Amino acid sequence: MRFAYGRLPWRRGAVLGSALLVLVTAPAASTATERSGPAPARSVILLIGDGMGDAEITAARNYSVGAAGRLAMDTLDASGRRTTYAVDERGRPVYVTDSAAGATAWATGRRTVNGRVSKSHDTDRPMPTLLELARDRGYATGSVTTASVADATPAALTAHVTDRSCKGPADMAACPADTRAGGGEGSIAEQTVAARPDVLLGGGADHFAQTVTDGPFRGRTVTQQARAAGYQVVRDRTQLAAARPGRPVLGLFAPEYVPVEWTGPPAAPGGTAPQRCATRNPGRPAGTPDLAESTRAALDLLTARAHHRGAPGRGFFLQVEGASIDDRAHEADPCGQLGETLAFDRAVAAALDHAERHPRTLVIVTADHGHATQILPHDARPAGLSATLVTDEGGVMQLGYGTALPGETQEHTGVPVPVAARGPLADRVRGVQDNTSLFGTVTAALGLR
């Protein structure tokens, strides 16, 4: 069955704040069964709306399906809140997290320093990730993003570096101990290939085009390293559709971030005239798959890959990130932000459709952190940047961005983010939880610990 979303009557479930985790699961199990019997879940799909807090979701809902409507991500059954904070090197709270520390929290179950990727806050040592644990237990694994596949959120599953900027072999200035010459495992791109997820889809071609400087692939690009490891390297939707599950797939659809879907005037001092967003970006190449397409492709490839492996009860672990919600909010670009939020919601719908066809499925939705967006009275005169939009239902909505001076990058916020779930173990997300709690939910669902 396919879900019909839009102006729906209220269903059990909460307004989500940011990311969606779909777990393919079995009937709820007791704690003893989780420890000693079959895992409650066969597969997990974790979808992350980067920077997609309550205001970002509400703005997208208002603009598209209306204030009384419901997005796909609004339809999950159990809901709660997650804290979002990092720590410093001494373990003291840092109340606003970045995406690296935020992703490390759910990927490893431990907090770390802002900018650090799946390494400890005090000793700077690698910490095992959900993807690594799932892979080592025989699950197929994958990561889909609209950022570079070497960006902070996907990197938290596949790499361990001191600083998130160390994406390719030429980017290692902030990570001397992580270089191969320094005794480390190399850049995020190199480590990601070495981690060997079955599916990697997103941007980041420029990072993979860099030349490896040390180790067995010295003098070759990271893309060549991937091909040597058996990866099918695809560059557009046609090549993605032709990929086969017998070998791992690396999709590089853009030099860095995948171009956004919508465009429009940015927020400005004193506001803008009421406007509509342009729902087609002329700067987006025609062959670029959208996030829902990439999600469906990854689900099909991983399902087939898991079946081919034949491990009893083992499906897959997949993370899907809508990265440019955060990127566009940083730039006070309301139309870009709304378009990416709605593109993410279509990926959520694709995941829910998959889960409906594969009944051992649990869905969890959350975010890494909040962002700068505020929904203001249409006649307000805010001190910061603002833009006024005319929604699909004919309303007037003013969005404000006031966490930085005009011309500077808007900031994350330290608020809790919504989390919601559907399926067995969904009740684990209820209440107010720590931002490391998803690690425990996923490991329990897949029987990883």
Curated annotation (Swiss-Prot):
GO terms under cellular component: extracellular region
Keyword set, alphabetical order: Antibiotic biosynthesis, Hydrolase, Magnesium, Metal-binding, Phosphoprotein, Secreted, Signal, Streptomycin biosynthesis, Zinc
Record text on cofactor binding: Binds 1 Mg(2+) ion.
Positions annotated as active site in the UniProt record: 99
Phosphoprotein recorded as keyword: yes
UniProt cross-references to CDD domains, sorted A to Z: ALP
Enzyme class at the top of the EC tree: hydrolase
Compartment(s) where it occurs, according to its Swiss-Prot or TrEMBL record: Secreted
Keyword Hydrolase annotated: yes
Coiled coil: none
E.C. code: 3.1.3.39
Region (Disordered): 268-290
UniProt-annotated binding residues for Zn(2+) 1: 326, 330, 412
Alphabetical list of PANTHER family matching this protein: ALKALINE PHOSPHATASE
Name of this protein: Streptomycin-6-phosphate phosphatase
